[in-house]
Amino acid sequence: MIADPAFGRLLADIRACTICAPHLPLGARPIVRGWPSARLLIISQAPGRQVHDTRLSFNDRSGDRLRTWLALDRETFYDEARVAILGVAFCYPGRDGKGGDLPPRPECAPRWHAQLRAFLPAIELTLLVGSYAIDYYLPQTRPRSMTEVILRWRDFLPEFFVLPHPSWRSTLWLRANPWFETEVLPELRERAAAVLSAPVASASPAPI
């Protein structure tokens, strides 16, 4: 049962959202995760095809890599009482013809993000995963390259932790930038562990 009627109405509105439907090859299927008790917020780009099919955020190889970066098992990662997950867009955008996915639809984040984040008052750390999330929440970083932005990761703490997207497309970048694994990931793991070790409220509304 949802304790806050306003929260329940927001969830219903999101699940019924079709504002991008004419542009979505598989139709609208908004995917978000989290409870208002969540301490860690992960904001990425948009669901991939496998996530669309399974309705489970980061249920793919990108998710495997992200969980490795965070040193989290699946049980902890998918604990909605502690971890909330949003995309810049909530629905799968389709393929781009070059082996990757199309960009997230631009209508989604302005329509829903502020409303959802208002119901996540316990968030202590927000991961901005990939260029679309970074550009949306840190527009001042444009037009810097991904490498330049990630090199400045300390500048955005303690609120935001910037990361490249963990997709296969980032493999060459990771090989070319070994400092990410040796300098950034240990700090990421330490901060995530500290945030997730905090006690969770005993009573939480229904998941988002």
Language-model-detected regions and their locations in the chain:
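A polyanion-binding, active-site-adjacent surface
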Residues: 2-196
